[in-house]
Amino acid sequence: MMYGEEKSDSLIVAANLANNPQGAESVERRSGAKGNAEQPHMRRTQSRESMSQRLSRVREAAKQRKKERFTALFHLLTAEALENAFLSLSRKAAAGVDGVRWKDYAENLKVNIADLHRRLHQGSYRAQPGRWHYIPKADGKQRPLGIASLEDKIVQYALVKILNAVYENDFMGFSYGFRPGRSQHNALDALATGLVRTNVNWVLDADISQFFDKVSHEWLIRFIEHRIGDQRVIRLIRKWLTAGTSEEGEWRASEEGTPQGAVISPLLANIYLHYVFDLWAHQWRRRHATGNVVMVRYADDIVIGFDKRIDAQCFRIAMQRRLKEFGLTVHPKKTRLTEFGRFAAENRASRGKGKPETFNFLGFTHISGKDRSGRFMLIRKTRRDRMTATLKAIKDGLRKRWHYSIPEQGKWLRRVVQGYLNYHSVPGNYPMMRKFRIYVTDLWRRALRRRSQQDDTTWTKANRLAAVWLPKVRVLHPWPVERFTARHPRQEPGA
C-alpha cells in the first residue's frame, strides 16, 4: 500500500537531485536505549520562541542525552507548526477521501488551522483512511497508491519535523533514504567512494520483500518508545497506522504495514530499519567481520561491500535470520551476491568465467571497469530497463498531447528531459544520456508524422526542433569521490 500525491507524468518527470549544497546533520553510531528522564518543559517559553528555536532545543537535548525518552513533545504541534506544514505541502496534490484540496483549505486558513489545532489537543482529531488509487509500474504491473486526506498530511508533516529533531541524532551514517539534507546521489556517492577507496571484492545487493506492507505495528511502536515517551504522540501514530484504506467507498483495515508514500511513512520506515537492521549490521561488522565491510542503505534497498567472500556469505545468512525475527524477508530474485571490484576481472578469468558481474542501485547499473591506465574504475550507467520504461512513458505522453502545438509539446518535453538529465547525468554516463536524447527526438519525430499523413517531419527538421526545445546533454554531477569528500571530510564511506 502507498500513500502519495497522484501527480500526472510521475514516471517521467524526475526530481532535480543535482548537487545538494546542504550538509547532512551529524549522526551518532550507537544503539537506542530507554531512559526515564524528562527533558525540560518548554511551555512557558514557547510563546516567545520561534518553532525553529524550539526544535533546536529538542535537537540539542537528543544529542546530549542519548538514552532520554522525550515525554513532552505533543505541545510542539502548535498552530504555527501546523500552518507552516500546510504551506509546505504540494498545492497540486490530489484530494483524499475528504475531497479537500489545498486551495479549498487555504480559503479560510486561519480558521481551519485553529480548528485542527483545537481537535488535536482536545483528542477529537480522527485519522482518515487513504483513498485507494492505482498507478502503473515499470514492469507493467500496477501499484496501489493511498491518497491521504489533507489534514492528515498537515499533522504528519508537522510531527515529522519534531521527530526528526530527535532521530537525526540517532540514525547511522550509512542510512540515506528520505532524511533531511540527504539524497539518492549522496547514497550513490558514498557507495562509489567505498567501492573505490576500500578493498571490496564482493557486493551483496539486498532488497527487503514488500517491506512497507510487512512492518509489524507492535514492533514499530516498541521501537519508537525507546526514544518517545509522550503517549499522545504514540496514540497519534497508532491512528495513522490503523486508519486503513478506502476503495470505491469500501473500507479496508490495516493490521500491519506502514502507509507507504504518506508524509510520515519514510520516517517510520527508517525507525523500524534502524533497530531491525542498522544497529545490528553495525554491530555484526565490528564483532564478526574479518575484512573490510562497506554499507549503504536507502530505505529498504541495501548494498553491502565485502573484502572476503566468507564474510558476505555469513552476513547474508545472519541477515535473513535477523529480518525473520521481525516479520521481514529478503526478495529471493532481487537479492544477489556479486563478484565485484578491482580484482574481479582477473579472478574470474583465472577460473574460466566471463566478464565481472554488475549490480543495480538507485537507477544505475554499477560496472567494474578500468581507466586508460588500466587501474580499477567504477562505471555507472543508467539502467536500460528504467530508460526503456521512461521512453515508453514519454511516448504515451506525446500521444496524450497529440493535438498540442509544437511549442506546447516542446515545452513539455524540455521539462521532462531536463528532469531526467538532472538525475542521470553523472560522470561516465554521457553516452547513455546522448542516446536518451536521440531516442526522445525520434519519438517526437514519429509523433509529428503520425498525427498528419502529410507531415514531412524529417530527421533534419526533428533535429532542428530538438536544438530549440530539448536541453543539451552535459555532465551535471561531480565525481562521487570528490563530492563525498567535500561533504564528509572526516567520515569513512559506508560507515
Residue ranges and their predicted role:
Residues M1-A495:
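Non-catalytic terminal/accessory segments
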